[in-house]
Amino acid sequence: MLKLIQSIVKNLIRVGIVSSVDYQKGTAKVAFEDRDQVVSYDMDVLVKNSFRNKDYWLPDPEEQVLCLFLPIGNGQGFILGSLYSIDDKLPIKNKNKRHVRFGDGTFIDYDRETHTLTIDFLHPEGGHIVINNAKVTYNETTQRGEPEWRSSEVLET
């Protein structure tokens, strides 16, 4: 009986590498090195919201993920999230920051201590910010006290 319980528990939580992603269904397949590269069925990916508020995130192929399987077997499981590792290190180490870094180097960073939101397009061609269907409010002076924007919202030079 104890061996059966150990076997079930050992198969409930597993670490693997994403082998493929179905961007239409929002699922991914995961290969498990400890099982001779056995590949899972399509697994749902845990997200922060899926009802009224919706959060879209899918892991990349070759990303290390943590998976949870139902105790009825390995036919139904879920990807709980990604893991940092020796190869994939933390992008920052600051308890006051929320940080999102994208594959092209672009990042969004909020520092709750300094109340600073930073958006940095590290891509050689720069980037675009698109705001649709919104009224934008902004401070009309720079730190130097000079006008930053004209009423037409064109940057002053």
Predicted stretch roles:
Residues 1, 56, 60-63, 71-157:
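Right-handed beta-helix
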Residues 25-30:
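Short aromatic-glycine-enriched beta-strand elements
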Residues 38-57:
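Beta-strand/loop nucleic-acid-binding surfaces
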